[in-house]
Curated annotation (Swiss-Prot):
Gene name linked to the record: asd
One GO term of the biological process aspect: diaminopimelate biosynthetic process
Gene3D superfamilies with a match to the protein in the record: Dihydrodipicolinate Reductase, domain 2, NAD(P)-binding Rossmann-like Domain
Catalysed reaction equations from the record: L-aspartate 4-semialdehyde + phosphate + NADP(+) = 4-phospho-L-aspartate + NADPH + H(+)
GO function term, MF aspect, one: NADP binding
Function comment: Catalyzes the NADPH-dependent formation of L-aspartate-semialdehyde (L-ASA) by the reductive dephosphorylation of L-aspartyl-4-phosphate.
Binding partners and assembly: Homodimer.
Species annotation: Shewanella sp. (strain DB6705)
Protein name: Aspartate-semialdehyde dehydrogenase
Spans through the membrane: none
Pathway named in the protein's UniProt entry: Amino-acid biosynthesis; L-lysine biosynthesis via DAP pathway; (S)-tetrahydrodipicolinate from L-aspartate: step 2/4; Amino-acid biosynthesis; L-methionine biosynthesis via de novo pathway; L-homoserine from L-aspartate: step 2/3; Amino-acid biosynthesis; L-threonine biosynthesis; L-threonine from L-aspartate: step 2/5
Catalytic EC class: oxidoreductase
Active site (record annotation): 132, 245
Binding site for phosphate: 101, 216
Amino acid sequence: MSQEFNVVVLGASGAVGQTIIEILQERNFPIAKLFPLASSRSAGGTVSFNGKQVEILDVDDFDWSQAQIGFFSAGGDVSEKWAPIAAESGCVVIDNTSHFRYDNDVPLVIPEVNPEAIADFRNRNIIANPNCSTIQMLVALKPIYDAFGISRINVATYQSVSGSGKEAIAELAGQCSKLLQGLPIEPKVYSKQIAFNVLPQIDTFMENGYTKEEMKMVWETQKIFGDDNIVVNPTAVRVPVFFGHSEAIHLETIQPAEAEDVKAVLRDAPGIELFESNEEYPTAVTESAGTDPVYVGRVRKDISHSHGINLWVVSDNIRKGAALNSVQIAEVLIRDYY
């Protein structure tokens, strides 16, 4: 990996963009020049990279032929406009929005699960990063899928407000402060109060009664595993936590498996930190926030189903759920395919 690359981070002023830049630095990604980009509203500010302040440039004025790799995290509309332009200019786009995820000719990649899919990046010079809730679930389920097969996934998510952006973080903090002082609140980011509450809606409702967030987990699981026979039944819930998503997962395996069998395949799996004791378990706040692993605990046999396994999975949605996964894709790209 002696070659260095000119790298774009589009959405550099946002939470995911800033974290991508931090992770690029932490992991010593071989960068010749970093181009932080944003809309004209955010251009002119700076980001810190390798001990220097780097100016955020206006995407409208950028010459894409200067870049070899681009990380996009500025929203689907921005990716729709700029990703094809960047890709046609020779920049490989790693897109963190949902815009390209369901296109058949765009690989949807979790490096611990299906790194071989990156080989298809030249179809359009675009690689899609999956949804945060899908990433942590499939990192945890891949070893189980390989060892025993999976026929059905029931999952309930408990997703932090950072998944909705900086405004949602501020809204939760502000509501908590006001309510503790006995002051009224006015929800803006969410349709209902989020402080001291849980909301069984993430994204818009679809005709089948599921939300778009829930259906993302269905579509993405089948595409990433390359298995349309897996049945996925999700309920996605927003909870008053700042960072880190949690998931209660109830599996039905094709081959029967005991809890100890499942722990054995999870123990040394890449990207996973396993909590084996019943008395110890990971949480979003105490383990996942600000860290990279996918944490798995409460692995147990389902007492209601002979092929059932239950587990609890938590991960930082901004890091592994978005920024880290994007950088890991780029690492595999330059190591094996560039």
